[in-house]
Swiss-Prot record:
The gene is deoC. This is Deoxyribose-phosphate aldolase. Gene3D superfamilies: Aldolase class I (3.20.20.70). Keywords: Cytoplasm, Lyase, Schiff base. GO terms for cellular component: cytoplasm. It comes from Bacillus velezensis (strain DSM 23117 / BGSC 10A6 / LMG 26770 / FZB42). The lineage of its organism: Bacteria, Bacillati, Bacillota, Bacilli, Bacillales.
Length: 222
């Protein structure tokens, strides 16, 4: 499997413009990335431009804080899928997890899983930099219980990104049948190799072109 085919080619900055998205799409076609990951406002354009290319359209839900209501996340999910999204990366209710309210966290994830209705992969961002190891494990177990397809480390907008240690912990927790996505701070092929060796099955990065061409990007997040 090629490195490119494991990368979600990502542009999530708030000031991203149409020209940036079109460039992202062009690169995704050229390098055959797994998907482009864009904010919901760009899903329709990305879906139109990528139709028939084999490149998926990924978007983000409850992003980047995870603090919207479950009903809002469900609506966002349905809306994104109606516009052509085939993968959604949702942020958990981080405060509820830290409060020990597992029932609320699982219900929040399940709301998105049910809204996706198997029409899109659901990746669950747990924001590892804000969690203890016990909380990371608990978040992963709740994501699996709620029916998610992937667990994911980070938004790229908080205090830290992916680490190989967190990927290994997440992989150990979810087992072999659930995807694990590393995101945040991944800039080089060495970073990617480290994450894959630790158990990642997908990489989120804005530096995809640099990674696959062997360069080094100065961008530390999305």
């Amino acid at each position: 499997m090629s490195i490119a085919s494991q990368i979600d080619h990502t542009a999530l900055k708030p000031h991203t413009q149409k020209a940036d998205i079109l460039q992202l799409i062009k690169e995704a076609k050229e390098y055959k990335f797994a998907s482009v990951c864009v904010n919901p406002t760009w899903v329709k354009l990305a879906a139109e431009e990528l139709k028939g290319t084999g490149v998926d359209v990924c978007t983000v839900i409850g992003f980047p804080l995870g603090a919207t209501t479950s009903e809002t996340k469900a609506f966002e999910t349905k809306d994104a899928i109606s516009k052509g999204a085939t993968e959604v990366d949702m942020v958990i209710n981080i405060g509820a997890l830290k409060d020990g309210d597992d029932e609320a966290v699982e219900a929040d994830i399940r709301a998105v899983v049910e809204a996706a209705d198997k029409k899109a992969l659901v990746k669950v961002i747990i924001e590892t930099c804000l969690l203890t190891d016990e909380e990371k494990e608990r978040a992963c177990r709740l994501a699996v219980s709620a029916g998610a397809d992937f667990v994911k480390t980070s938004t790229g907008f908080s205090t830290g990104g992916a680490t190989a240690e967190d990927i290994a912990l997440m992989r150990k927790t979810v087992g072999p049948d659930i995807g694990v996505k590393a995101s945040g701070g991944i800039r080089t092929k060495a970073d990617v190799d480290s994450m894959i060796a630790a158990g990642a099955s997908r990489i989120g990065a804005s530096a995809g072109v640099s990674i696959v061409s062997g360069g080094d990007s100065g961008s530390s997040d999305y």
